[in-house]
């Protein structure tokens, strides 16, 4: 019994001495966080803190010397350039629509698509969000979805921003490639630059003078939303087509004051009854209104 007690005490003391030494080692202390490991991080997985070109240290004139006055100047400017509140960006895909006719003008929501938009509007109303801005793609199906949602939430239609940059398109050649969908290279070049411009327009940390958390609703399209998610989370943008989101679903991204981005919902449509869950264009036109 005495030997067992001595063994336990000795082992405990040994572990205590080991961890005490690890804590005293600054380099080892970094690895005490559960978010770190001893395995080297692949370069592509490293977070770019200046992804939105609004990292305070990139905006402030660098220190010219180590004098107290210069350090005070630098610290004051750095603090002034920092965001203080979070931005919430809620993305809604349009409802189901019919791809008939030769132009976007004929691509109206189906009855099911209108019902989907109604459920989404009710869900957004239940969340009790006070919207700072609502932006909608200029395509018919997004405009109709936006109009239906606006009937459920408190926001003046005249204040909605209509943005052509958000129109559906082919953002970037997907990986892995798919055989059933092969846009021309020129389409990727044309659409990709536009959709990337839309991302840069709407995704960034708050301005330093923003005094409260803000909420922006964007009503758009599946390809655009999926690309936005990959870009915002700094995942390989080529993987956008691996994500599937339902019609009129809700995707919620939050940009913290530090510039870190997290996702709260991805294609959430659990608030709809099962018979309304769709994600593809209906092919049986005869049975769809």
UniProtKB/Swiss-Prot annotation:
GO biological process annotation, one example = response to anesthetic
Primary place of residence? mitochondrion
Pfam families named in the record? His_Phos_1
Catalytic activity entry: O-phospho-L-seryl-[protein] + H2O = L-seryl-[protein] + phosphate; O-phospho-L-threonyl-[protein] + H2O = L-threonyl-[protein] + phosphate
Checking PANTHER family in the record gives: PHOSPHOGLYCERATE MUTASE-RELATED, SERINE_THREONINE-PROTEIN PHOSPHATASE PGAM5, MITOCHONDRIAL
Q: Which family does it belong to?
A: Belongs to the phosphoglycerate mutase family. BPG-dependent PGAM subfamily.
Q: What is this protein called?
A: Serine/threonine-protein phosphatase Pgam5, mitochondrial
Record lineage: Eukaryota, Metazoa, Ecdysozoa, Arthropoda, Hexapoda
């Amino acid at each position: 019994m005495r030997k067992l007690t001595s063994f336990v005490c000795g082992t405990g003391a040994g572990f205590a001495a080991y961890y005490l030494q690890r804590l005293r080692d600054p380099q080892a202390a970094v690895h005490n966080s559960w978010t770190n490991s001893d395995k080297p991080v692949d370069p592509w997985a490293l977070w770019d803190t200046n992804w939105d070109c609004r990292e305070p240290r990139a905006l402030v004139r660098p220190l010219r010397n180590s004098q107290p006055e210069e350090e005070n100047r630098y610290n004051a400017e750095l603090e002034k350039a920092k965001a203080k509140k979070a931005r919430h960006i809620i993305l809604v895909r349009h409802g189901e629509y019919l791809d008939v006719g030769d132009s976007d003008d004929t691509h109206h929501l189906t009855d099911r698509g209108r019902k989907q938009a109604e459920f989404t509007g009710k869900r957004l109303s239940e969340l009790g969000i006070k919207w700072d801005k609502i932006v909608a793609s200029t395509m018919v199906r997004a405009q109709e979805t936006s109009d239906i949602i606006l009937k459920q939430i408190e926001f003046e239609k005249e204040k909605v921003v209509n943005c052509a940059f958000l129109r559906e398109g082919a953002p970037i050649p997907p990986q892995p490639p798919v055989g059933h969908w092969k846009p021309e290279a020129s389409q990727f070049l044309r659409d990709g630059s536009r959709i990337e411009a839309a991302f840069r327009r709407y995704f960034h940390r708050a301005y330093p003078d923003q005094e409260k958390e803000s909420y922006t609703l964007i009503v758009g399209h599946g390809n655009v939303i999926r690309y936005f998610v990959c870009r915002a989370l700094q995942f390989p943008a080529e993987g956008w087509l691996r994500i599937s989101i339902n019609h009129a679903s809700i995707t919620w991204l939050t940009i913290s004051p530090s510039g870190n981005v997290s996702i709260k919902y991805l294609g959430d449509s659990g608030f709809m009854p099962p018979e309304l869950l769709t994600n593809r264009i209906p092919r049986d036109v005869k049975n769809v209104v």
